[in-house]
Amino acid sequence: MKYNNTSEINPLDYILGQERAVEAMELGLKINNPAYNIYIAGEPGTGKSTYALKVLNEYASKKNTHKDWCYIYNFENPREPIIVELEKGFGRELKKDMEKLIESLLEDFKNAFESENFEIEKNKLLDEYEIEKDMLLKQIKKYGEEKGFKLKQSKMGIVFIPLKEEEDESDKSDEEFYKAKRELENMAIQVVYKIRNLEEIAEKAVLELEEEIAKLVVEPHIKRLCEKYENYDKIQTYLENIKKDIIEYMYLFYLDEEELKDKYDKEHFIKYKINLFVDNESSKNKESAPVVVEINPSPANLFGKAEYDYANGNIKTDFTKLLSGAFHRANGGYLVLYADQLLKYTMSWEILKKTLQTKKVILETQTAIKPENMPLDVKLVLIGSHYIYDILYRYDEDFEKYFKVFVDFDSEMDKNEDNEEGIARFIAYQCDKNNLRHFTKSAVEEVIKFSTRLSGDLEKLSTKFNKIMEVVIEGSAYAEFRNSEYTEQCDVKKAISEKRKRINRVETHMDESIENGFTLIETEGRKVGVINGLSVLSTGEYSFGRASRITATTSPGSKGIVNIEREVNMSGSIHNKGVLILGGYLSENFAQDLLLSLNAYVCFEQNYGGIDGDSASSAELYVLLSSLSGVSIKQNIAVTGSINQKGDIQVVGGISEKIEGFYSICKTKGLNGEQGVIIPRKNQRNLVLSDEVNDAVRDGKFKIYTVERVEEAIEILTDVKFEEIKKLVKEKLISFSKIQTVSKE
């Protein structure tokens, strides 16, 4: 590209270097099948989360599946609240409509039952009752007087008293007196029965009147709501039940204010409330499908929960206290979860699988309430590491059933013109987005060099854009400190060097230890059975190369090669394997006509923290051959590379860091033009060295040797032909064998 600075080029609008991942993601999003959920794997910083959200929002914008979800009271089974799906915005409308309905009815009922017309109609019914009641009482009163008794009403009923108490009852026979009294009492029973029957008829008539008025009050409101929600069968049924319930319990609507407050806050009026479970009217992107990211996937956060009231040691809840989870809010769209966080909650993972299996979002409570489950319509995107993917795939048989699409993010991409241009456009995008100083072309080239260094391969670029982004932000900051309009190459270099300075405390202390002579490393002279091996140490995000003194001693015996680190449990399995390979090499090259009879001890001197990896196996072989042959090894050359049993030198990691680590030691002790390193030839493409080391190599102050075979390396280290060394080693092993044979005799 021809440009002076990144303000002149188009910002990057796509994910860079992830063609395989993009194709897989597109496939997963296009297949509308509940088993085709997506697992995105990749190293931190490769942009998988950023890309996932970007592409999900793009797909979400193409389909408007936002729905509202409400829980309503179940009149047939109150323990099982009903879930209702409504068009976006209708949930909020329904909630408001029901609140207005109750408010209106409270006022309308009060007006209706306090109206003059109602009192007139009610009194008319009651007057009819009173007239008939009076007629019955008059009849029995008259008849009683004819029989000589006065009628008296009490709480116990009707009582008859003789009219003339002073009159001698002997004037009448006892039989006549009691006969008349019994007759009147029987008649009174019939009258009381008829009066009570009249009361029931009157009460029923008044109730029918009240119900008729209640219907006149309620039906217009319910009819209006039924028309508004005519497309929702569950709402139609609910409103019909509401009407019946209000008419049945209409007395609640004309209680005084204090009584009503208690009733409304507690029991009956809960039936008329709406739980707006998922309100998508309030979502940011109302015209697209939901995209939900849940960073704390606890069971409650994923699948919802119920809130509880505690009273007298008991817990109580109802459908209005049900709260939605991420699965509910994402329904009709996409849900993004992070695998490492999800697996912290074992129950979440198990319920998730059950949800995918049943195709229903399972909301569990601690009480008897069992809400109807929401039907599942979610594309699940799980983001995590390759390690977690492998573990789930291998040990969870359900994982493969529900995550059919694997989106694999690479940590590197080919170093070509298109991708280099992509990095320049990435920088342009970040500068525009974050208001940074735009980068000059030379500054961009320095960032590209940094990306190559991150990849550890001259033919690759890193896709760890979080690391690249750090350099971009910090480089821009240093340009701003200089009051420069643009970020220059020097700003990028300073950002990289200053970052290293902030995190290389351990490396600095180890350099000081070598300089002070506390750690024994020599960069001049020759020694038998001593070699400088190269390794990489990591402290958090920082890795650096170190030289370690490796020594070997040999003697007659039968122990074979003894890895001292292994004996004290300070070496890992890969390092142990590398040491065992040494025995295979020695057996093939020196023990075809004799038994190996030696004790060989190999040790990383002054190693107090353990070791793993096989990159020092070649150095261990060279130092063994030196000890056996008596040929000294140059201390000005350090070695890295693994070997196989056939003597081939194999590639290793961290090659640039190892070279720079030994160069730093040589620089501290004084460069003499003879110092250098031996590396595997196939590692040449991994040499992404600092400018200082490149300059030193170019100027002949430091050397890098590449080898493919053990024979090449040992000759560089000793200036002795391999055949001569082989002869000396063979002679020593023969002498060891003889000594061992004599000792056995």
Model-derived regions, located:
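Conserved ASCE/P-loop NTPase catalytic core
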Residues: M1-Y393, D398, K404-N416, E420, ...
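Peripheral, non-AAA+ core regions of ATP-driven protein-machinery
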Residues: D318-T320, F327, G333, A339-T346, ...
